[in-house]
Amino acid sequence: MRKIELLCPASSLEVLKIVVIYGADAVYIGGEAFGLRAKAKNFSMEEMAEGVAFAHAHGVRVYVTANILAHNYDLDGVREYFTELHNMKPDRPDALIIADPAVFMIAKEVCPEIERHVSTQANNTNYGTYQFWWNLGASRVVTARELSLKEIKEIRGHIDDRMEIETFVHGAMCISYSGRCLLSNYFTGRDANKGACTHPCRWKYSVVEEKRPGEYLPVYENERGTYIFNSKDLCMIEHIPDLIDAGIDSYKIEGRMKTALYVATVARTYRKAIDDYLESPEKYEANMPWYLEQIKSCTYRQFTTGFFYGKPSEETQIYDNNTYEKGYTYLGIVGAPNEKGLYRMEQRNKFSVGEQIEIMKPNGDNVLATVLALVDEDGNEMESCPHPQQVFYVKLSETPDEFDILRRQENEAIALD
C-alpha cells in the first residue's frame, strides 16, 4: 500500500497553524501573486517563511500554488517570485503547484531544489500526460476532476512508480472543465484563470431562447430562477478504501477561501477516517456515522462523489436553491492564557456570557462549555464581544487548550451572495 498524504488548504498563517495541529500531512498555500485565489488573504513572503518553519517543525510539508495560466507580462514577475522562494530562510517550501509549461520551466531553472507538482488546471486526463510531466521533472500530478477512479487506477498502472498522484477528495466543485472557466471573464471582466473568479456558477439564472418562441427548455427552477451551474460539494469520506485501491498518494481538500473552523473540521475528520481504516477497516465502518456528523457540522452544499464512479447524473447539481447548510458558527481560536487564567481570543462571530458553546479539539473531542466571563484588553468585563476581530479574554466552565476552536451549534441554511 502506498503512503497516504492528507493535503489541506490554508488561506492565512493562522489557518496554516490550525490545519497543521488538526492533522494535515501537508498544506497548500498561495502567495500574493500567481495563484488562483486572489480573494483569499494569502501569504506575504514573511508570513510564508514563518508558516513553512512552523509546518516543518511539526513534520508537515508546504506547497505553494503558482497555477495561473500566464501571459507574456507575467513571466518576469514569476521569475522574481521563484527567486524569492529559492532564497527563503530558514526553510524553503517543499513544492510548487504549477499549471503553465512556461512557469514550470522557470521553476525548474530558478529553484530546481523545490519539487514541481502539476496542477489540476493542466487538465491531466491520461497516463501519457503524466509520463510527459514526469519526464520534464515533475514529481507529482494532480488529476483532472473529470477522471473516474477506474481511470486513475489505469494511470497508476502505466506511469513510473515513483511518480505521485494527487486528487481532490472533498470540497466545492467548479462547473467548468478542471476549473478552466470563462464565465467570470464574460460577465465581470475578472479572469478566473488569473485568480479573480467571481463565481457566476452560483448565481441565479433564467433561460430565454429568443429565436424559439413558445419552446421551453427542460430546466429545473423555482420562483427565483434556475441554478443550472450549481454543483453539489464533493465528499469521499465514505470511500477511503476505493481511493486507496486506485493508487492515489495525496488526498486533497478544497478550500483556500474557507474559515479555520471549516478546514480544521474537515482535516480532523479525514485524518481520523484514514487512520481508522489503516488500523482496521471494521473500525472505519463503525465510525462512519461520526465522520458524516462532523463533516456536516460545517458549511456545505449537499454532497456528491463527482466523477469518481462515472459520469455524474442530474443528481450532482442543486437546482432549487443557492444556500449552504450550516451546522455551527465559528466563534474563534483559543490562544494562550494570561496570568489570571483567561484565554486570549480574536472574535470571529459574536457570543455572550452565559451562552453554551462547544470546544472543538484536535484529537476529535467536542466539549460543551458555558461562557463564564469576557474581558477586554483593558481588563473591563463585557457581556458580549460584538465587534469583528475584537481581541479579548474568555473564561469557560471547561478548560480549553491553545489552538482549540470555539463554535456554536446553529443547524440552519444560509443564502449565498
Regions found by a protein language model. Give the residues of each.
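Gly/Gly-Pro- and Ser/Thr-rich, intrinsically disordered tail segments characteristic of DNA damage-repair
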Residues: 76, 114-127
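Surface-exposed amphipathic alpha-helical tracts and adjacent flexible/coil segments at the periphery
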Residues: 1-22, 26-33, 51-52, 58-88, ...
